[in-house]
Amino acid sequence: MPIRVPDELPAVSFLRNENVFVMASSRAKTQEIRPLKVLILNLMPKKIETENQFLRLLSNSPLQVDIQLLRVDSRESKNTPTEHLNNFYCDFEDIQDQNFDGLIVTGAPLGLVDFCDVAYWPQIERIIAWAKEHVTSTLFVCWAVQAALNILYGIPKMTREVKLSGIYQHQTLEPLALLTRGFDETFLAPHSRYADFPVEVLQQYTDLDILVSSEEAGAYLFASKDKRVAFVTGHPEYDVDTLAGEYQRDLAAGLNPQVPLNYFPSDDASLRPKASWRSHGHLLFANWLNYYVYQITPFDLRHMNPTLD
């Protein structure tokens, strides 16, 4: 089954050109099934690009998924047209009385910003608290992982001296877990962050199950035992050229960034990289939708009981 989005959303034509199955709302209304309601809190500056990336992964599932886009920052965006935000995004006040099967909170370029200095930090705290009662399962990505660990577990912000950027090898620690079902024993995934997620810190201060880790990148995938929250510290949604764009951006800003590890052929930034993480990203999101959302969410969202023993 496809993702279900508004007819006019730019991602519709973009993803159809990639042969991704996207169903516009006008057609979806003719199917007599209840789609999964998934809310995406998009914190990235280039919102249309991020929409395309996450919708691509959510589309590769036998489940019909009804997408609602959420924003929290009311300031004028430099990277996304205001018309697009007004047409396709809702504010928290619009949905705070609703329930959702799933919530995805994206990353944000805030790795060196203290939580107290994040303009919309109070809104992040409010949404994470709200999700406990209104969402079956929440998936946090990259910076959102750091934010959620602080809010839910009191873990302070931990920052690397040098930005982690590139494609890193990962080891599946719990191959029988539902979220890692079908994972290879080792696989590649992108990272782009200053945040640090040491395995030993998570083991000491939380009861989260650490499912995947990396010797270089630390904990990559972990989740609560009741499947209400899951965390991925990398960017399995990234396009093949996303890291290249970030590298060129940082160069232009005079930040003297390191060349992303294991990304450009022969570490030559003039050569086009190749994606080596797509299959993992699709499998991760399919597993989350199936085992953490679909299998435990109630048919009637008015009666939330999102726990699986």
Curated annotation (Swiss-Prot):
It is an enzyme of class 2 (transferase). Substrate binds at residues 163, 192, 249. It is found in: Cytoplasm. The record marks 192 as: Important for substrate specificity. The active site is at 142 (acyl-thioester intermediate), 235 (proton acceptor), 237. It catalyses: L-homoserine + succinyl-CoA = O-succinyl-L-homoserine + CoA. Pathway: Amino-acid biosynthesis; L-methionine biosynthesis via de novo pathway; O-succinyl-L-homoserine from L-homoserine: step 1/1. GO terms for biological process: L-methionine biosynthetic process from homoserine via O-succinyl-L-homoserine and cystathionine. Transfers a succinyl group from succinyl-CoA to L-homoserine, forming succinyl-L-homoserine. Belongs to the MetA family. NCBIfam families: metA (TIGR01001). This is Homoserine O-succinyltransferase. The lineage of its organism: Bacteria, Pseudomonadati, Pseudomonadota, Gammaproteobacteria, Enterobacterales. The gene is metAS.
